[in-house]
């Protein structure tokens, strides 16, 4: 997260860290959001093909890697990794995946402050501002963060986002902005490498966090004037429901 601030324990109980085996060491790879006691939503590009389940694990209830043995922290193995069937490797569209934990996540009145995130109730496109969180790089090519960070970004209407990326002078003309994407930022604040798959969310009138997007592949981090790319969760609800039933 670029230009973010450090979060406090328990503020985002549905946030997870996905670790991937790199040369026999498990390392921070992506973020994700807990949907229910079995399923987590994240990005498709987080996973190398062919998928080897034992090369990934998920941490819940964690805020800082300096305290990864804290009593709130739980680690889960995975039983399924389901990539969206229309996702193409290194592509930008349909960059969404669902992962299932091998054992259920205790979210019902969990003393560990672990919970699922809600979906927004309305069908209208989100507008205004939204927040993204993660343990990713704090600047392009920079170090990753030991602490979970948060940043609030302006949402950019997709037509405008499409114009920015598709402009003849754009350095990222190859990125096709489609209606199933959300764009946010462009003001120097952004998600970055290793934040992928993490949640973009807003708060409803009751103050409940609602998931509107997941961090997707995009331009370089915090690239001046270019908004960050997210998958629009509402566009994938029927796919998600089908996978989870």
UniProtKB/Swiss-Prot annotation:
> What Pfam families has UniProt attached to this entry?
Trypsin
Ranges for domain Peptidase S1 come to 1-245
Q: Which CDD domains match?
A: Tryp_SPc
Q: Report the active site residues.
A: 45 (charge relay system), 95 (charge relay system), 196 (charge relay system)
Matching entries from SUPFAM superfamilies are given as:
Trypsin-like serine proteases (SSF50494)
Looking at the record's lineage, which domain of life comes first? Eukaryota
Location in or out of the cell: Secreted
Q: Which GO terms describe its molecular function?
A: serine-type endopeptidase activity
| Keyword terms of this UniProt record | Disulfide bond, Hydrolase, Protease, Secreted, Serine protease
Q: EC number(s)?
A: 3.4.21.-
Could you tell me in which tissues this protein is expressed?
Answer: Expressed by the venom gland.
The cross-references to InterPro entries, in alphabetical order and at most eight, read: Peptidase_S1_PA, Peptidase_S1_PA_chymotrypsin, Peptidase_S1A, Trypsin_dom, TRYPSIN_HIS
Q: Which GO terms describe its cellular component?
A: extracellular region
* Disulfide-linked positions: 30-46, 161-183, 192-221
GO BP: any one term: proteolysis
Which PROSITE patterns does its entry note? TRYPSIN_DOM, TRYPSIN_HIS
Q: What family name appears in the similarity comment? A: Belongs to the peptidase S1 family.
What is known about what this protein does? Answer: Protease. Hydrolyzes gelatin and succinyl casein.
Q: What is this protein called?
A: U21-ctenitoxin-Pn1a
